[in-house]
């Protein structure tokens, strides 16, 4: 039956327009120690902040994917329905494979919304990494270039919006992230001093703003300040 699964029943019970977001999080070995601890703390802060906003709590849906190795930590669900996560650092940085999976999850979720008559805002993919894309041996891989044309098409057709965040990345890593976000009119934002909680507060505030906007309305996002870097001009 169409509404036999818990997911279907949840969609039937709550007809609120959805604000879907994929958190695409680097958990490779280089995130060990303080970085992964701050990332987990930031995720807790994000969850708490979304739940403080009644409208966002009914609208914002998260899918969490970690990479190193690529793992779906949680499928799309309202934030209150997600179990708290405790991520661990391990493995290399298969960024291309992780981003491909995120794009697939967005496509599948939009299909589910349409199947159940749920309206939705343009999905977000929020990519956060501290390194460069690698192959299985941990060597730099340029295979991310295979995604540039699909990303350009996705941006032109407004299929989703991609934001890229670099955690003290190298010049080469920043070049990769800039290339990935360029089709969406953005660039890599540098996350200085491991300010994960501030970054996730910006994200929750921005998603909350989107969830309260009118269909078709251009949403001017809050300009995040991370370290000394003010990233302005994000418009959805």
Name these PLM-found stretches.
Residues 1-22, 28-37, 51, 110-121:
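Acidic, polar low-complexity linker/tail segments
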Residues 39-52:
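An active-site-proximal "capping" alpha-helix that borders the catalytic cofactor pocket
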Residues 131-183:
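VWA/integrin I-like adhesion module and closely mimicked acidic/polar interface patches used
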